[in-house]
Design a protein with these regions (language model features):
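N-terminal loops that bind phosphate or other acidic moieties
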Residues: 2-349
Length: 349
């Protein structure tokens, strides 16, 4: 689907399916809402899929891999070559996300949407890395749309293969810089308030990073009311690709799990493009990056975990898969009040 076709297919979650799922939970022989957010999330997933019979047996992680030209400004501790190394390690089960996926019973799909050199992972390359946003726009508007459509395509493909839920992840040196820039614009924040040390910058490095972001925003003047313009001028291909996954999930009625800071920025972009996307987003954890709480407050979707994680790659998103499996085991397998010939609990007024 094109971006335009995708947006036409996005509708709010199915309230009838949500009501049916809630009624089933209330008939299960346990105190009402005693599994808390686990129950709420299953109800939300029923609304996303339009079916109270929730099936998440096939689970995926899509990792958007791309380089960022802004690394030329010295805003990272690691060199650009690390992006390709880690991206190819996903397929060798030598990266954190791939190891967690194996344990969680999920399949990983690393996508080369913009690595600076050729790679051996799934190819949907829009550019060989973005331009240096300190000097010129990161990409054209057309390239930003193309990156969004890569994410949409991935969801369509995975739906055809029977996947019922998709987690989002990324790999790209310099992407906390681009994510902070996008956040600063969309949420009208000073860059100093939404910029962290990334993978381990010194105090001097952090000041440089903040300065680069502030100058890039002043140079390009991205329009906060136009998320695609923001992505094109100060964003990254990985962010745009993940935003496309969120858009595609909403259009295809598949729940999409946000990971940490960068993934949540992508979710924010998708929701700003189409507000109904919010109904299809599950947030997994609270990252250590300073902007995370600001973004989560803007998204207004409760998170599952607070484990001080900040690795990226989709690691936090995949970590909630076993929790969802346990929730669904209760939802689908536990006896009801009628099975036990017991009276239902009555909600307190």
């Amino acid at each position: 689907m094109t971006l335009e076709e995708t947006l036409e297919k996005i509708h709010p979650a199915d309230k009838t399916a949500m009501e049916a799922a809630l009624a089933h939970w209330n008939n299960i022989a346990m105190p009402l809402h005693s599994l808390g957010r686990l129950q709420d999330t299953v109800v939300r997933i029923a609304g996303m899929t339009g079916n109270a019979r929730v099936d998440l047996k096939k689970k995926a992680l899509v990792v958007m891999c791309a380089d960022n030209g802004v690394v030329e400004e010295g805003v990272t501790q690691s060199g650009q070559e690390v992006t390709k190394i880690v991206a190819e390690n996903f397929l060798k089960e030598k990266a954190t996300a791939s190891i967690l996926c194996k344990k969680a019973g999920a399949d990983i799909f690393p996508v080369d949407i913009g690595i600076a050199t050729d790679s051996t992972i799934l190819q949907h390359k829009v550019m060989y890395g973005t331009n240096n946003m300190a000097k010129e726009p990161a990409m054209t508007r057309e390239q930003a749309v193309q990156a969004l459509e890569v994410g949409i395509h991935m969801v369509e493909e995975l739906k055809e293969k029977g996947y019922g839920i998709i987690a989002t992840g990324e790999m790209g040196i310099g992407n906390t810089t681009t994510s902070s820039a996008v956040t600063a614009v969309l949420l009208e924040q000073d860059p100093a308030e939404v910029t962290g040390r990334g993978a381990g910058l010194s105090g001097t490095g952090l000041k440089k990073k903040i300065s680069v972001i502030r100058d890039a925003i002043a140079l390009h003047k991205p329009k906060k009311e136009d998320p695609i313009d923001v992505l094109a001028k100060v964003g990254g291909l990985d962010i745009a690709g993940m935003a496309g996954v969120f858009l595609g999930g909403a259009a295809c009625q598949i729940p999409v799990v946000a990971d940490g800071f960068i993934s949540c920025v992508a979710a924010l972009c998708a929701i700003r493009i189409c507000p109904a996307v919010k109904d299809y987003v599950i947030t997994s954890h609270k990252s250590k990056e300073p902007a995370t709480m600001i973004i989560l407050e803007a998204l207004d979707i409760p998170v599952f975990l607070d484990c001080d994680m900040c690795l990226g790659e989709g690691t936090g998103a995949v970590t909630i898969y076993p929790i969802l499996d346990m929730a669904l085991a209760v939802y689908g397998g536990m006896c009801t009040f009628s099975d036990n010939q017991m009276e239902n609990y009555v909600p307190l007024v």
